[in-house]
Every structure is written in structure tokens, then in C-alpha cells.
Amino acid sequence: MMKYDTIVPIGKSTIQHGFFNDRIYLMKIHPDDVVLIDQYLTDLQGLYQYAKIIMKVPLSLEKIYKTPDTIEEARIPGFYQGVEDALFLSRFLDPTRAEDDAHDKIQEIIQISLGKISVSKKGIHPVTWVMRKATMNDVTHICSLYRSVFETYPFPIQEPDYLKKIIQDGIEFFVGEISDRIVAAGSCEIDPYASAVEMSDLAVDEAYKGLGLSKKLLSYMEKQMKMKNVKTAYTICRAEPLPVNRLFAGAQYQYSGTLINNTQICGTYESMNIWYKTLH
């Protein structure tokens, strides 16, 4: 079985670390935990010597975390309660991890996604389907869909036990059905402290590609988040595939930055683009 990185709650904050991605990821920090987090980051790096540390922090903590060996890879304006920016700050402890070999290709993908370079588009065929919030009864079918779409993934979303746990912990999944068959899925992970939501895990059955189902499901997920008064939506997606970047750009998300060699996918480290959208 694949060994995924560990997610550790520290006070009101959250860190992920491990050798699957060979990194430490400060996913969420609460101001009350700054001293604890500083010590934990130091201890982890001293123990494991990870190649990269990435930290998502509010602008007010920039002076603490933006040291001379740290670079800002992305920024989401008004991430915290629609007021304070979130910074994605990275330290590359292994210089080779900072080598951006795909830079030109990624920039071209961004420009195409934003409509600055024209490409031919397939016509979207009308389709009748149902979108709804997933329940525990859907877990097996969602995992089956993810196994068919993703060869590897940063989190074990193809495993029913894991999916059940994160649903119990509050992550919401949404599905699209055609003839009572789940053919698309996606997740919303709300950060109540920030009033922000990560839109993630979007997948469509290969047999139903080209019908605009991802766009429809993303729009539905956004509407559900607006009803909860969430202020900002964002995604961290693979930087090189055109479809997922064009999906978010087409849904009026703004490009925020690129996390270089951030995530292990199919045995290599890939860069990830960040897109965000103000919902309220």
C-alpha cells in the first residue's frame, strides 16, 4: 500500500509532512499557535531533512515566516474573511527541487487558460443529469471513479475508509449523476476561520468527457458554498494539464501563482497552479 504523508493537527493549526511529497506543508495556521508551529517545523526539518517547506500564512505573519531563504510563490487577496491576504511561502532545502524546468510550458498553459492564446474548443453537448451533495452511501462509487481517473494522487481519496473519515471530519463531496450513475465528483474543504474553501478532487468519468460536466459541477459547488456565506474559493491544481486550468479560468477564477515541484504525481514532482475567486 502506498505510504501517504501524515496530517498532524497542532493546536488550531494543521501540518502535513512526509516523504511521499518530500516536504512539509503548513496547511493552516492560527495566530495562537505561532510558537508551537515554529518549534514543530524546526524539529521536523531537523529530523527528516525534507526537500521543501511550503507555508500558507496570513499577511500579518509575513515578517515571521518570510526569511531570506524563503520565496513567495503565490498570494490570494482577501483569503482570510475577505480582508487579509494569504501568502504561500516556500523554502527549498534541496536546490534541485527549485529548478523550474517546465516554466515555459506552464506559462503557455496559463496564457491559453486566460484566453490570451486561442485554441480550438470542442462543442459541448446538452446533457440531462442530477447534481447533489454526496452521502456515505456514495463513498464506494466515488472511490471507484477516482481510481479510474487518477493513477496516483497526493491523498488516498481512492480508499473508502479515508473518504469516509474526511467526510466525517467535515469535507463535503458533491456528485453528478446520469441515469443514477455517478459520473463526476468534487470536494469542498471549508476553512471556517478564513471563510475560504478549497475546491478540489474534481473528476469526470472518461466516458463522459467533453460534455462540460466539470464546469457544471464546479458551478453547483460554488452555489452551495455561497449559501454558507463562504467568501473565497480557491484551488491548487496541476500546472501542466490544460483542461483543469482552463476550467477554473473559464469560471472566472484568477491566477495567483505557481508552486514549483510541489506535489508527487506518478513518481515525479509536478508544479501546481493556484486559482482563486471571490464569492462574496
Regions found by a protein language model. Give the residues of each.
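N-terminal charged segments
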Residues: 1-48, 62-63, 83
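A conserved beta-strand-loop-helix scaffold within acyl/acetyltransferase catalytic domains
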Residues: 6-23, 141-206
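Short amphipathic alpha-helix that is part of the acyltransferase structural core
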Residues: 20-27, 103-108, 112-156, 274
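Conserved acetyl-CoA-binding loop-helix of GNAT-fold acetyltransferases
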Residues: 31-43, 204, 210-227, 246, ...
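Conserved GNAT acetyl-CoA-binding A-motif
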Residues: 45-57, 225-237
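Conserved catalytic-core motifs of GNAT/GCN5-like acyltransferases
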Residues: 56, 71-87, 236, 254-269
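Conserved active-site tyrosine of GNAT-family acetyltransferases
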Residues: 64-67, 89, 247-248
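C-terminal "cap" of GNAT-fold acetyltransferases
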Residues: 80-105, 116, 261-280
